[in-house]
């Protein structure tokens, strides 16, 4: 290769890109795009691991005799899941209660556990806590056959359960009817007045307008 041509190629390789040039902007965009892609990939892997850990717990605590779960049984299983750290928290509290300890040990671990349980409890008592749909017999069978491969998670149908799901519909309806009945009785009882002995009794219906109603006397203190 001629020396002149070789020198030109070396110079071209060492050419510095201007920081405000279009080439520099393109390189910056590609770098940000790659960083975002890696971040999303990491976040997705983390979410899959968390979901996998949760599903492994439910898988290991399934009742092998059941072909499907009722809402009540599924809610009881969720309650057990929300109580899964109770033994560890007791051990941490016991260690912290021992005399001559300087500060609280395992504080970061304790804080993470409590934050996790608080978030899960809010979900369960709010818009719902997601678990495998073990109320469906086919999904339960698929879940039993799961080999803990995270790539197979899309094959497991999920559903949300709330704390209210533990109460049968008939009992809910009965409670609603009782409340409506009590409200109806209150409406039928009409307005009330005050008597000298402090007990309330129906007010007089002799007047029809507010102007004609007798003011309720204020009892002396």
UniProtKB/Swiss-Prot annotation:
Pfam family, one: Tma16
Function according to Swiss-Prot or TrEMBL: Involved in the biogenesis of the 60S ribosomal subunit in the nucleus.
UniProt feature coiled coil, ranges: none
Name the record gives this protein: Translation machinery-associated protein 16
Nucleus among keywords: yes
Cellular component terms per the entry's GO annotation: nucleolus; nucleoplasm
Gene3D superfamilies tied to this protein: Translation machinery-associated protein 16-like
Single GO term (MF): preribosome binding
Region Disordered: start-end pairs: 180-221
GO biological process, one term: ribosomal large subunit biogenesis
Intracellular or extracellular location(s): Nucleus
Domain of life the protein comes from: Eukaryota
InterPro entries: Tma16, Tma16_sf
Record's keyword terms, sorted: Nucleus, Ribosome biogenesis
Subunit structure: Associates with pre-60S ribosomal particles.
Presence of keyword Calcium: no
Family statement: Belongs to the TMA16 family.
């Amino acid at each position: 290769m001629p020396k002149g041509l070789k020198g030109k190629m070396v110079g071209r390789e060492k050419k510095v890109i201007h920081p405000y040039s279009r080439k520099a902007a393109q390189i910056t965009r590609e770098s940000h795009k790659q960083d975002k892609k890696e971040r999303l990939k990491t976040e997705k892997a983390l979410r899959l691991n968390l979901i996998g850990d949760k599903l492994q717990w439910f898988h290991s605590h399934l009742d092998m005799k059941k072909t499907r779960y009722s809402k009540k049984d599924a809610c009881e299983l969720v309650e057990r899941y929300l109580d899964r750290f109770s033994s560890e928290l007791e051990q941490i509290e016991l260690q912290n209660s021992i005399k001559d300890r300087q500060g609280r040990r395992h504080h970061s671990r304790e804080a993470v556990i409590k934050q996790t349980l608080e978030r899960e409890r809010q979900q369960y008592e709010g818009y719902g806590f997601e678990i495998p749909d073990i109320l469906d017999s086919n999904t339960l069978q698929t879940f039993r056959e799961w080999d803990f491969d995270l790539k197979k998670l899309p094959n497991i149908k999920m559903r949300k359960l709330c704390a209210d799901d533990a109460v049968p519909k008939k009992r809910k309806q009965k409670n609603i009817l009782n409340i409506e009945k009590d409200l109806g009785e209150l409406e039928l009882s009409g307005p009330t007045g005050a008597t000298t002995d402090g007990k309330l009794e129906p007010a007089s219906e002799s007047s029809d307008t507010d102007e004609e109603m007798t003011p309720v006397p204020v009892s002396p203190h």
